[in-house]
Amino acid sequence: MNVKLVSYTRDGEKVVAIASKMSRSRKGWDYHEKTMTDEEIEVWIRDAILHGYWSVLEHSIYTFSIEGISRVASHQLVRHRVASYTQMSHRFAKPIDEYYKPITPPSIEKRAKEIIEKAYQEAYENYFKLLQDGVPEEDARYVLPNGVNTNIVVTMNARELYNFFALRLCSRAQWEIRAIAWKMLEEVKKVHPRLFRYVGPNCIIHENFIRNEPITLDEVLQKDNIEFISQRCIEGVMRDGILKCIRNSKHVLEYLK
């Protein structure tokens, strides 16, 4: 799996901060662009996110190239509908030779690797038999497994990314889409750390709505003295188990090593 941020709004943090401030100011864009300091950028981003004023996040756009994932994962991705997608077509880009690398889930890798490898190989052979019999590519691909590898270009704004991360960083998310989410988060934090400082699974998002001082995902991952106020997360995990649950979620990246 390879996840790469290929394009983004360069001044996204400042754009979001100015938009947030302009909603409460009589002055226009030019004034705020000239006068806004780095400290103000952080203040206005924090204010918007922690008060649920997420519409301003929509002004910053991010495009990712996500390669070497299964069709199972890509079908989950496109359920996030406030986004744009362009996926590799198995009609025009036939999955042959080195381009046929179906994804094997870790649970099967440990228990039934031979079974899935045999099924993948049989599907591959049947695909070619259909092509040789004159079946069109768009119909022959019906025998390909859900695990067949694919590439996809994904564009989301920062608000949709917050919603995406809230769902897909959660340990209850399926392992592959969860790994994609963690890798996407790594990419956006490289370029806009202030904008994505308060991102996290839903347990962190909802926790910060009721705290006087917000917590960050980095703090939860690195510090053992973090205590949650919420009695339980929206997935039903009790307060004492939330910290461990979040940390377990990121362990999915170890499958990819």
Curated annotation (Swiss-Prot):
Binding residue positions for dUMP: 76-79, 87-91, 141, 168
InterPro entries, A to Z: Thymidylate_synthase_ThyX, Thymidylate_synthase_ThyX_sf
Signal sequence interval, chain numbering: none
Binding of FAD, residues: 55, 79-81, 87, 157-159, 163
Gene3D superfamilies, per the entry: 3.30.1360.170
SUPFAM superfamilies on file: Thymidylate synthase-complementing protein Thy1
Enzyme Commission number, as recorded: 2.1.1.148
Obligatory cofactor(s): FAD
Biological or metabolic pathway of the protein: Pyrimidine metabolism; dTTP biosynthesis
Key words, A-Z: FAD, Flavoprotein, Methyltransferase, NADP, Nucleotide biosynthesis, Transferase
GO molecular function: flavin adenine dinucleotide binding; NADPH binding; thymidylate synthase (FAD) activity; thymidylate synthase activity
Annotated catalysed reactions: dUMP + (6R)-5,10-methylene-5,6,7,8-tetrahydrofolate + NADPH + H(+) = dTMP + (6S)-5,6,7,8-tetrahydrofolate + NADP(+)
Cofactor note: Binds 4 FAD per tetramer. Each FAD binding site is formed by three monomers.
PROSITE patterns registered for this protein in UniProt: THYX
Motif (ThyX motif): 79-89
Active-site annotation: 168 (involved in ionization of n3 of dump, leading to its activation)
Keyword Nucleotidyltransferase: no
Top-level lineage group: Archaea
Domain ThyX: 1-202
UniProt key word Iron: no
Entry similarity comment: Belongs to the thymidylate synthase ThyX family.
Role according to the record: Catalyzes the reductive methylation of 2'-deoxyuridine-5'-monophosphate (dUMP) to 2'-deoxythymidine-5'-monophosphate (dTMP) while utilizing 5,10-methylenetetrahydrofolate (mTHF) as the methyl donor, and NADPH and FADH(2) as the reductant.
Name by which UniProt lists this protein: Flavin-dependent thymidylate synthase
UniProt source species: Sulfurisphaera tokodaii (strain DSM 16993 / JCM 10545 / NBRC 100140 / 7) (Sulfolobus tokodaii)
